[in-house]
Design a protein with these regions (language model features):
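Short beta-strand/loop motif that positions the catalytic acidic residue
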Residues: 223, 229-231, 235
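Alpha/beta-hydrolase fold catalytic core
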Residues: 1-37, 59-62, 100-101, 281-282
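Flexible "cap/lid" loop of the alpha/beta hydrolase fold
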Residues: 116, 120, 124-162
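Active-site loop/oxyanion-hole signature of alpha/beta-hydrolase fold enzymes
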Residues: 21, 66-110, 126, 275
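Conserved HGGG/HGGXW glycine-rich cap/lid loop of the alpha/beta-hydrolase fold
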Residues: 24-74
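Catalytic active-site module of serine/aspartate enzymes centered on a nucleophile-bearing elbow/loop
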Residues: 253-282
Length: 282
């Protein structure tokens, strides 16, 4: 199987659709046995973005749970629409459905943001079901602040132009290239382009709006579990200041800085995520 095929395929495992009260159906895949590791992807992405991370994790004695965020991949959007509280509620539902105890929640980009909202909204769930969290290329709101890339791309998303840009191989690949650091394989760019083109439609604009408008930094002190904060030093989407604040204001947090790496840590440094998860589960 080629690298591109390995990246784009849906992982094999037990497929579950969790029904939410508003009609949302959350597409989940689980595999393995042992302490639970939950992988939460970012905006316009899908659970497939974790294929390289999964390749490493499956060598460990862990149970991995991946899911498509509502409105992404095979997960639908229910009557309550797209909002940070609704999506934090989805996290809660997944933790409860899989009866997670002493789990490690790994959130990338928006997935990390929603982990913060989960901890703020449902602190008892985090304290009883999670052993630790890992916030990768993450933030806690006001995501346009200090990011020229976001200030340029958000108007394109709001205008409904992003899918058209991403469907153009030249324009799309040029844009996706900015999500990575110094060195990147062409397969990573192409697979990311295809996935984001399918999910960045105009009816998903609420996903952008709540990350721009909401500020959950004042709530970071409420996070009571050990937290690893991972950031690429060339991240243009969630610049360094976000991870600096996460690391400084979450009581039991530790920063990891990745030289030459951009926003797409799940592709650029999956071995780092795997290594840190191993330390957390053990």
């Amino acid at each position: 199987m080629s690298l591109a095929d390995r990246l784009i395929r849906i992982p094999e495992g037990i497929v579950t659709f969790i029904e939410r009260p508003d009609g949302t159906r959350l597409h989940c895949i689980s595999m393995g046995e042992g302490p639970t590791v939950i992988l939460a992807h970012g905006i316009f992405n899908e659970l497939r973005c974790f294929n390289l991370v999964l390749q490493h994790l499956l060598n460990r004695k862990v149970r991995v749970v991946l899911f498509d965020q509502r409105g992404h991949g095979q997960s639908s959007i229910g009557a309550d629409g797209l909002g940070s509280r609704q999506m934090a509620g989805d996290y809660k539902a997944i933790l409860e459905f899989f009866d997670v105890k002493d789990g490690v929640l790994v959130g990338h980009s928006m997935g990390a943001f929603l982990a913060v909202v989960l901890a703020e909204t449902y602190p008892s769930v985090v304290e009883t079901r999670l052993k630790a969290m890992m916030l990768v290329s993450g933030h806690a709101g006001v995501v346009a602040k200090g990011s020229v890339q976001n200030q340029l791309q958000i108007p394109l998303i709001r205008a409904g132009l992003m899918p058209r840009i991403l469907r153009s191989q030249w324009l799309g690949r040029s844009f996706i290239r900015t999500l990575f650091g110094k060195e990147v394989r062409e397969e990573y760019i192409e697979v990311t382009r295809l996935i984001l083109a399918a999910n960045s439609t105009k009816d998903r604009i609420a996903l952008v709006d709540f990350q721009v408008k909401e500020d959950h930094y004042p709530a970071l002190g409420q996070i009571k579990v050990p937290t690893i904060v991972v950031c690429g030093e060339q991240d243009r989407t969630c610049p360094r200041w976000h991870s600096e604040r996460l690391g400084a204001e979450i009581p039991d947090a530790r920063n990891i800085w990745l030289s030459g790496v951009g926003h797409a840590v799940v592709y650029e440094a999956p071995e780092i995520i795997d290594h840190e998860v191993g330390l957390l589960v053990n």
